[in-house]
Amino acid sequence: MNIQDLPFLPVYFDRYITQIPGDLELQDAFEQFAPEVIFSDTDLLLQLGDQVYAPGKWTAKDILQHCIDTERIMTYRALCISRGETISLPGFEENLYAQNTVAATRTVEDLLDEYNTVRLATRMLFQHMSEAMMLRTGSANNAPITPLAIAYMILGHAVHHKNVLVERYYPLLTSNGV
């Protein structure tokens, strides 16, 4: 299955889903957009340290933790919907979650190890869903969504944050003479 099989693009998450080529089959997308591929520039992440491009913004480690947390939450939503859950699953406040982690005390390598482990579980969940399960419509944060859309949202969300790092964080390294 691929993005073209989606019965609709969910509001808000479309900006993440469209980061992934529409004809890319889901399991191929999981390979092409694996954390170790998207965030393969570990040296740059390490060089960034705790630098941020503006006051109040997250560090690179905060971004990795956010991607991990979001993937876990989205995977839970996909599991619930695929199994027939009918209640609207709750949203979450990403900044509150970011304030309540220990990402600052962790290494980039440790975060990437966790991310890869979470991704393996995510991939296995979607690999063993039927087409009907993938296309079942449920509700999250009071908006309709399908597990297939969630899968591509997870991948596109990581791409989005990689782009933020490239566009806003990595230039800090050259401006600081690193």
Positions of PLM-derived features:
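Phenylalanine-focused residue identity feature
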Residues: 8, 13, 30-33, 39, ...
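Acidic/histidine-rich alpha-helical segments that form the ligand environment
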Residues: 28-42, 97-135, 154
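Amphipathic, non-membrane alpha-helical segments in soluble helical-bundle scaffolds
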Residues: 20-30, 57-64, 105-115, 148-151
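Short, contiguous alpha-helical
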Residues: 1-10, 47-94, 135-178
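Short, contiguous, helix-prone interaction/anchoring segments in small proteins
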Residues: 21-56
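Terminal targeting/low-complexity segments that flank the catalytic cores of oxidoreductases
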Residues: 1-32
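A short small-residue
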Residues: 12-17, 95-103
